[in-house]
């Protein structure tokens, strides 16, 4: 059924603007913390369709993340951008972002997982979402978060990371709980999440007989999908328009395969 919906979505996307996509700010909770997510969908489509959870990079739920949600909605998915930090908690600069992200990535990562689970729960509640087709994608910090979510045994069919944080040294044993198909999209020259970390994760996935793909983009560093990262690879993070386009196409092909 969704294959027909997806074909219709692609036709509509070709003839209409993403301005036709409906968006909503959604308040929800994890424990006592109020969170503020962002929902995007195409109201012209009828029937249940796959839902995609999106987890933001370390700067929090920003316009970049919202744009990605609208793009996915334009492809026929119900997209929900989760809020890991909390309503009104948004870093003002990289220093603040680094400190805040570290709070979630340190230790056993229970809070990070709980916040990601809260976002997935909110997505599952949506009546437009096909509950057997739940996907999660994440950028940088968010890539780490969606992998940690998958490691809880969450009912995800697919997980995609874009230049994701790959340090799972304290949680690598939980790879055995992953039920999802996994796609890692990564810069071959990423100094913040080096190839050695990716290879450690890959070994664990291979040992546990997971279905996974790892794609490295040559000449590409961290944050390669984000134009605000600038264009100087020597800084370790830089936008790469070619890798951005290729990784987006890799994701869309992968999710289309999962939607059959």
How should each PLM-predicted stretch be described?
Residues 155-165:
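A conserved short beta-strand
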